Amino acid sequence: MTKEKIRVKLRGFDVELVDQSSKAIVQAVQKAGAKVCGPIPLPTRINKFTVLRSPHVNKKSREQFEMRTHKRLIDIIEPSAEVMNALLALELSAGVDVEIKQ
């Protein structure tokens, strides 16, 4: 017997926003009466960029920037229509990308 589940992936640059959004999703789903696994922290992706400080001279003088992408995974086991309505009605911050798969 296979169990139906919904997988929610959260992605963002600010770790606090990602954690707040994951807590809000877990609370909404538990309030609707479904079983939740997570939030599971996935590896943080770090993109590093090195650029010249000056456009003309001083080749040895460089500046480094990094961009961190934080990810969380939440599994909702045996969701109902009420759980889906709770997920769709949830207001999350603009800095978090939410991907829902079945």
From Swiss-Prot:
<dbReference type="InterPro" id="IPR018268">
    <property type="entry name" value="Ribosomal_uS10_CS"/>
</dbReference>
<dbReference type="GO" id="GO:0000049">
    <property type="term" value="F:tRNA binding"/>
</dbReference>
<dbReference type="GO" id="GO:0003735">
    <property type="term" value="F:structural constituent of ribosome"/>
</dbReference>
<dbReference type="GO" id="GO:0006412">
    <property type="term" value="P:translation"/>
</dbReference>
<dbReference type="GO" id="GO:1990904">
    <property type="term" value="C:ribonucleoprotein complex"/>
</dbReference>
<protein>
    <recommendedName>
        <fullName>Small ribosomal subunit protein uS10</fullName>
    </recommendedName>
</protein>
<keyword id="KW-0687">Ribonucleoprotein</keyword>
<dbReference type="GO" id="GO:0005840">
    <property type="term" value="C:ribosome"/>
</dbReference>
<keyword id="KW-0689">Ribosomal protein</keyword>
<dbReference type="InterPro" id="IPR036838">
    <property type="entry name" value="Ribosomal_uS10_dom_sf"/>
</dbReference>
<comment type="similarity">
    <text>Belongs to the universal ribosomal protein uS10 family.</text>
</comment>
<comment type="subunit">
    <text>Part of the 30S ribosomal subunit.</text>
</comment>
<comment type="function">
    <text>Involved in the binding of tRNA to the ribosomes.</text>
</comment>
<dbReference type="InterPro" id="IPR001848">
    <property type="entry name" value="Ribosomal_uS10"/>
</dbReference>
<dbReference type="InterPro" id="IPR027486">
    <property type="entry name" value="Ribosomal_uS10_dom"/>
</dbReference>
<dbReference type="Pfam" id="PF00338">
    <property type="entry name" value="Ribosomal_S10"/>
</dbReference>
